Amino acid sequence: MSQSEKENQGSGEGKTQDMAIFSPPVVRSGAGALNRALFTKTVNLAAAAVNDNRLISKYRKELEHSKELLRQDRLSPIVNHPDKALADQGKKCLLLSPNVKAPEPETWGAALKEGVQKKELSVIPYELQLNYDYWTYHDIITSILPEELHDDIPSGFNTAGHVAHMNLRERYIPYKKVIAEVILDKTTNIRTVINKVDNVGAESEFRTFQYEVLAGPDDMQVQVTENACSFEFDYSKVYWNSKLEAEHRRLINMFEPGEVVCDVMAGIGPFAVPAGKKGVFVWANDMNPESNKYMQVAINRNKVSQYVRPICEDGRTFIHHAADSVLEAHKNGEHVLIAPKPPSRAKKAPKPEPKRVDIPPTISHFVMNLPATAIEFLGCYRGVYAGHEDLFSAESGRKLPLVHVHCFSFKADDETPLNDICERITKYLGFPVKPGNPDVEGEVAVHDVRDVAPAKRMFCASFRIPREVAFAERV
Ligand SMILES: C[S@@+](CC[C@H](N)C(=O)[O-])C[C@H]1O[C@@H](n2cnc3c(N)ncnc32)[C@H](O)[C@@H]1O
């Protein structure tokens, strides 16, 4: 081996650092209480003590370039000198790669050797102390769980404000408390960890769930911000899913200021409140009285009471009631007045009049986010505008409402889910539909929203209510 080859090998160039030394100790404490003190470790390294602090940045760059500097996630290579007296004088060290050994100059690379030769550096042993705070959730849990559980370490959870909501698989249940404690320690802004309690697949009518608190206080009163609106609610009493923010935004972006939107299953208002904020009139219904209560809270918090009306009834009856009530509001001349921007003080222009926006006579969009069953409500559109063909005459320029109905279907790359969804819409609407352009009567646009299970996805189907359905006689 030539001298340069020896030097190369010694300096760690071309060699991967042995990073296993930074793994936490294996603490197979079982399902018992989490003992954070067991997660301490001393890693023996070498460090380049820098004689003059003004040279730190120069040597940091050089040693980084020659791959002699320690590169390890969440560890700064610049540390205080291990000698307390020198540290008190402000002396610093640069931590070196584990391949570099202080007593073995043949492991030092050219940059290090040169620094030592110039008496600007000295290479010293350094005992790096690592503890529980250093390691990630994954590191700690891997260290605790037995190896047969390493293949699918629980990592995902929903959050609602300070609450992390887990849905642990059966085989991780014995470790639920330890897992929750570590999540609590390692996730900023999480104060409570809960686990969904299996209720043998049965979902509650209001899409709430049974849970047990695994770590932190049993405090389910949460605050969240979504689409620039703030919500405060009891997460145990109403439905909330932070993973739907993009879907909420997608539909909100379709609504125009001054239009009317009827949200049939509005929850606490993640469609309604931001839509109201952009000047859309919203009739926001939910059958859960708790949702209705917290929607009112959100309306007040976000100052959208001029635009958003909370209603609490069965969505099936709401559909006709909403069409009638919007028309009534229009006939009564209900409107909002939008205060103009104050004129600049320099101009002595007369104060501009507020802008009046009337509630239009008809609904532009219905939203139905209750994916498990909403399609079954579609029969309720029959007769929604019975006797009101005039409202949608060619001269009026008005179109029948678009319905956006959420649903579940298969996960497949072909047309299977589209055809499945269209078949079910056909059945419940009582009118044949096929995949296509929602502006064409009898055609449906299907948007793929998100994965919900290995073989199941959530979709949103959008279509205009067919004339035959809208103008049918009410029974
Ligand atoms: C999946 S959540 C969606 C809530 C909200 N739209 C969202 O995106 O977060 C479905 C909502 O439907 C409400 N709900 C269930 N059955 C209903 C019915 N028959 N009529 C009206 N609302 C209903 C539940 O209370 C729940 O808030």
From Swiss-Prot:
Which EC number(s) does the record attach to this protein?
A: 2.1.1.228
Q: Kindly give the InterPro entries that the UniProt entry links to this protein.
A: MeTrfase_TRM5/TYW2 (IPR030382), SAM-dependent_MTases_sf (IPR029063), TRM5-TYW2-like_MTfase (IPR056743), TRM5/TYW2-like_N (IPR056744), tRNA_Gua_MeTrfase_euk (IPR025792)
Question: Which reaction(s) does its UniProt entry say it catalyses?
Answer: guanosine(37) in tRNA + S-adenosyl-L-methionine = N(1)-methylguanosine(37) in tRNA + S-adenosyl-L-homocysteine + H(+)
Places the protein is found: Mitochondrion matrix; Nucleus; Cytoplasm
> Keywords in UniProt for this one?
Cytoplasm, Methyltransferase, Mitochondrion, Nucleus, S-adenosyl-L-methionine, Transferase, tRNA processing
The record ties this protein, via Pfam families, to:
TRM5-TYW2_MTfase, TYW2_N_2
- Specify the domain of life of the species encoding this protein: Eukaryota
Q: Which GO terms describe its molecular function?
A: tRNA (guanine(37)-N1)-methyltransferase activity; tRNA methyltransferase activity
What HAMAP family does the record tag this protein with? TRM5 (MF_03152)
According to its UniProt entry, what is the function of this protein? Specifically methylates the N1 position of guanosine-37 in various cytoplasmic and mitochondrial tRNAs. Methylation is not dependent on the nature of the nucleoside 5' of the target nucleoside. This is the first step in the biosynthesis of wybutosine (yW), a modified base adjacent to the anticodon of tRNAs and required for accurate decoding.
Record PANTHER family: TRNA (GUANINE(37)-N1)-METHYLTRANSFERASE (PTHR23245:SF36), TRNA METHYLTRANSFERASE (PTHR23245)
This one is known as: tRNA (guanine(37)-N(1))-methyltransferase
- What species is given as this protein's source? Neurospora crassa (strain ATCC 24698 / 74-OR23-1A / CBS 708.71 / DSM 1257 / FGSC 987)
